[in-house]
From Swiss-Prot:
UniProt cross-references to SUPFAM superfamilies, sorted A to Z: S15/NS1 RNA-binding domain
Localization (cell): Plastid, Chloroplast
Family: Belongs to the universal ribosomal protein uS15 family.
GO cellular component: chloroplast; ribonucleoprotein complex; ribosome
Protein name in UniProt: Small ribosomal subunit protein uS15c
Amino acid sequence: MIKNSFISLQEKKDESRGSVEFQVFSFTNKIRRLTSHLELHRKDYLSQRGLRKILGKRQRLLVYLSKKNRVRYKELIHKLNIRQLKTR
């Protein structure tokens, strides 16, 4: 499923590299890579800090997308298998 979304986003890469969906997708890939790294290296605090920063950036982009276009937000959440944002 992730590979399929990667392929579809790669095809659109030339014209949409700066789109919110592509940015969230690339942050999600980085998050998954860092998570697997931290499972092996639990005390790598610099990587933990980097992971928290990327999580914050992705969360801000998802908040922006949910406010601007709820349908695109729901589709992206479903494609990338991410939990929805907590509402206050």
